[in-house]
Curated annotation (Swiss-Prot):
Site (Cleavage): A108, C109, V148, S149
Gene symbol of the encoding locus: rseA
Region described as Disordered: spans on this chain: 147-166
Membrane topology, Cytoplasmic segments: 1-104
Gene Ontology molecular functions: sigma factor antagonist activity
PTM annotation: Sequentially cleaved by DegS (a site-1 protease) in its periplasmic domain between Val-148 and Ser-149, then by RseP (a site-2 protease) between positions Ala-108 and Cys-109. The N-terminal fragment is then degraded by primarily ClpX-ClpP in an ATP-dependent fashion. Sequential cleavage by DegS, RseP and ClpX-ClpP frees RpoE from RseA.
Protein name (database record): Anti-sigma-E factor RseA
Topology versus the membrane: Single-pass type II membrane protein
Transmembrane feature ranges: 105-121
GO CC, one annotated term: plasma membrane
Activity regulation (UniProt): Responds differently to heat shock versus acid shock; degradation in response to heat shock requires sequential DegS and RseP action, whereas degradation in response to acid shock requires only RseP.
Length: 216
């Protein structure tokens, strides 16, 4: 009802003293009166280029009226501890087979290296023992024919040094094979010891012992 009276007062249709008195004392009516004038000026095109609006009070009031949201605290859940892959039962079963396959692979690699080394050394020794081809010098010197000369090959290396090199290489190969065999035996003994400890621990479980005594 008051808005209609304010609109009529703004248009000059009525003049109410009580309405003017209320308008001077009521801030809400003053805001409505200002809004009406702004709307009319906008419709007529009488508004300035820059408009100043103070909406801070409305924003603060809207923030205060918003309900407070209560967020429940998050309860951390217990996470399972990561299991090491070495302690998995599947790995305990596969470990002996993997160790044997590894040993076989290492043995094959060592044998291949020995064979290739021996063949390479034999090939080098054969090429070093071949005599040089004779060279015939038939070019004339100072317009005169020179006699044909036959190049004599140099003396071959002594056979004793070559045999010593072969023996030294064989000794090294035998030492490598002996070292590998020793490492393989130590590894197999360690695996057998670990398997025996595992079986002994499985036999000494308290539940199994009590069942055995009750059956007796």
């Amino acid at each position: 009802m008051q808005k209609e009276k304010l609109s009529a007062l703004m248009d000059g249709e009525t003049l109410d003293s009580e309405l003017l008195k209320a308008l001077t004392h009521d801030p809400e009516m003053q805001k409505t009166w200002e809004s009406y004038h702004l709307i009319r000026d906008s419709m007529r095109g009488d508004t300035p280029d820059v408009l100043h609006f103070d909406i801070s009070a409305r924003v603060m009031a809207a923030i205060e009226n918003e309900p407070v949201r209560q967020v429940s605290p998050l309860i951390p859940e217990a996470q399972p501890a990561p299991q090491q892959w070495q302690k998995m039962p599947f790995w305990k079963k596969v470990r002996p087979w993997a160790a044997q396959l590894t040993q076989m692979g290492v043995a094959a690699c060592v044998s291949l290296a020995v064979i290739v080394g021996v063949q390479h050394y034999n090939g080098q020794s054969e090429t070093s023992q071949q005599p040089e081809t004779p060279v015939f010098n038939t070019l004339p010197m100072m317009g005169k024919a020179s006699p044909v000369s036959l190049g004599v090959p140099s003396e071959a290396a002594p056979v004793g040094s070559q045999q010593q090199q072969v023996q030294e290489q064989r000794r090294r190969i035998n030492a490598m094979l002996q070292d590998y065999e020793l490492q393989r035996r130590l590894h197999s003994e360690q695996l057998q010891f670990e398997q025996a400890q595992t079986q002994q621990a499985a036999v000494q479980v308290p539940g199994i012992q009590t069942l055995g005594t009750q059956s007796q």
